[in-house]
């Protein structure tokens, strides 16, 4: 089952003090009766260059020869469990991710435009090993906070590489006010800024910060 993650929880991606090279993010949800098409996607960013978006992988832009990531397909109804309990699965080779990439955000997006609150039992788990070959479930995050599901997209969490090239995963569970792929790309690509006070109702803060700046503040 692994560690049950809450908002802000962080897990180190290592086993017996050795860094893991292969991890999988598996996301699951129930059938909703509304034919809502939920998509799992990952955004690769270079935060040493002010969080510039480097790569994006989702159902419409899968592995295409990349050595470090593979998206295992699109479940359009919530009824197609690909690997055990997962509807959509993304596999990462952490040791093959280009050095300049330091953050990998995991997002769930309702392609058909409905609020995610209509989708039951949203859950993501991080485990070591390839899809279908689970070694250890490292953490499971149930995304059931209604404030996180008021829009069509939610930032599930992110993988982050530190200064000594060790990776960790942090659960976030924050709603994103973006729907289409191009809108989501803008969220994760500076110099595009977001108005945190208006968009996220977090109270007085500096008027403009990047999405990554916002995330760091939540858990600093």
List PLM regions with ranges.
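Intrinsic-disorder/low-complexity signal
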Residues: 1-219
